[in-house]
C-alpha cells in the first residue's frame, strides 16, 4: 500500500478552538485510509501565532517562540487523534523514528512540529523522504502556489504545474522566523527537490479536496514534479 504524507495547515484544521474542521477531516481521512497508508503533519495555525505573539511581547526570543509553536502543533495533532479514534495511532509522533514505528500498527500516524526554526511543511517533507512516500500533499488556506500572495495581490496568478527547481526559485525569499506563514519554507523545497517526491498544493479549507486528489486523481491546485510525470492516479 502506497504511503502519502499530508501537511495539514493549522489554519484550515483549527481556525479557532470554537470553530474547527476536525470532524470534516476525520470523515475524509478515514475514507482515504482504506486506499493508502497515511501520515499527517499538523501545523499550529492562528493559535500558534497568537501564543508566539504574546511570548514575544513578554520578551521571549525566537528559540522560545519556536518551542511554543511546536507545542501548539502537537496540541492540534492531539485533537485530530481524538477525533480519529481507533483509526489513528493513539500517540503524537515526536520524531521521524517514532512515526515509522507507529506506522507498523497500520493506523493513521499524526505528528506536529519537531525542530525549531522549521515549519511543519519542512517536517512533512523530511517525513515523506524518511518513509519513502509516493506523494506529499500540502493542504493549506489557498488553492495552490501563486506568483504573489493572492490575499494581498489581486493580480496574482496560480501556477498549475511547477518543477522542484521552479518551486525553490519561488520560495527562496520566504521568511523563516517563528510563526511565519508562507507557502513552503526553503528546507521543504530542497528536500522535495532532492527526494523527487511529487507535491500537491491544494485548498485545505474543503477537506474533500484530499479525497478528490488521492482517490479520483483531480487536483485543483499546483502540482510540483519533474516534467513529463504525474503523481495523480488516472
Curated annotation (Swiss-Prot):
Entry's Gene Ontology molecular function annotations: ATP binding; UMP kinase activity
Cited CDD domains: AAK_UMPK-PyrH-Pf
Positions bound to UMP: 44, 66, 114-120
Location (main, coarse): cytoplasm
Cysteine disulfide links: none
Pathway: Pyrimidine metabolism; CTP biosynthesis via de novo pathway; UDP from UMP (UMPK route): step 1/1
Keyword Metal-binding: no
EC numbers on record: 2.7.4.22
Gene Ontology cellular component list: cytoplasm
Localization terms from the record: Cytoplasm
Statement: the UniProt record of this protein carries the keyword Zinc: no
Reaction(s) the record says it catalyses: UMP + ATP = UDP + ADP
Entry-linked InterPro entries: AceGlu_kinase-like_sf, Asp/Glu/Uridylate_kinase, Uridylate_kinase, Uridylate_kinase_arch/spir
Stated regulation of activity: Inhibited by UTP.
Residue ranges of the TM segments: none
Residues given in the record as ATP binding sites: 10-11, 45, 49, 140, 146, 149
One Pfam family matching this protein: AA_kinase
UniProt keyword list: ATP-binding, Cytoplasm, Kinase, Nucleotide-binding, Pyrimidine biosynthesis, Transferase
One of the GO biological process terms: UDP biosynthetic process
Family statement drawn from the similarity comment of this UniProt entry: Belongs to the UMP kinase family.
Assembly information from the UniProt record: Homohexamer.
PANTHER family: URIDYLATE KINASE, URIDYLATE KINASE PUMPKIN, CHLOROPLASTIC
Function of the molecule: Catalyzes the reversible phosphorylation of UMP to UDP.
Protein's UniProt name: Uridylate kinase
Gene: pyrH
Amino acid at each position: 500500500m502506497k504511503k502519502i504524507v499530508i501537511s495539514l495547515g493549522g489554519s484550515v484544521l483549527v481556525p479557532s478552538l470554537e470553530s474547527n474542521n476536525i470532524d470534516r477531516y476525520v470523515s475524509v481521512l478515514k475514507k482515504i485510509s482504506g486506499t493508502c497508508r497515511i501520515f499527517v503533519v499538523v501545523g499550529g495555525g492562528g493559535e500558534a501565532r497568537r501564543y508566539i505573539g504574546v511570548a514575544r511581547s513578554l520578551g521571549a526570543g525566537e528559540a522560545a517562540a519556536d518551542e511554543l509553536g511546536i507545542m501548539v502543533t502537537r496540541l492540534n495533532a492531539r485533537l485530530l487523534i481524538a477525533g480519529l479514534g481507533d483509526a489513528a495511532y493513539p500517540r503524537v509522533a515526536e520524531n521521524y523514528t517514532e512515526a515509522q514505528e507507529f506506522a507498523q500498527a497500520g493506523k493513521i500516524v499524526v505528528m506536529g512540529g519537531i525542530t525549531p526554526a522549521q515549519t511543519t511543511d519542512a517536517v512533512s517533507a523530511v517525513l515523506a523522504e524518511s518513509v519513502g512516500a509516493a506523494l506529499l500533499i500540502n493542504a493549506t488556506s489557498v488553492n495552490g502556489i501563486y506568483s504573489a500572495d493572492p490575499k494581498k495581490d489581486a493580480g496574482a496568478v496560480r501556477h498549475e504545474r511547477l518543477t522542484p527547481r521552479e518551486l525553490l526559485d519561488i520560495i527562496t525569499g520566504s521568511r523563516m522566523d517563528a510563526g511565519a506563514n508562507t507557502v513552503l519554507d526553503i528546507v521543504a523545497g530542497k528536500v522535495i527537490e532532492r527526494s523527487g517526491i511529487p507535491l500537491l498544493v491544494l485548498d485545505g479549507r474543503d477537506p474533500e479536496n484530499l479525497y478528490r486528489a488521492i482517490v479520483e486523481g483531480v487536483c485543483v491546485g499546483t502540482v510540483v514534479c519533474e516534467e513529463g510525470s504525474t503523481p495523480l492516479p488516472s
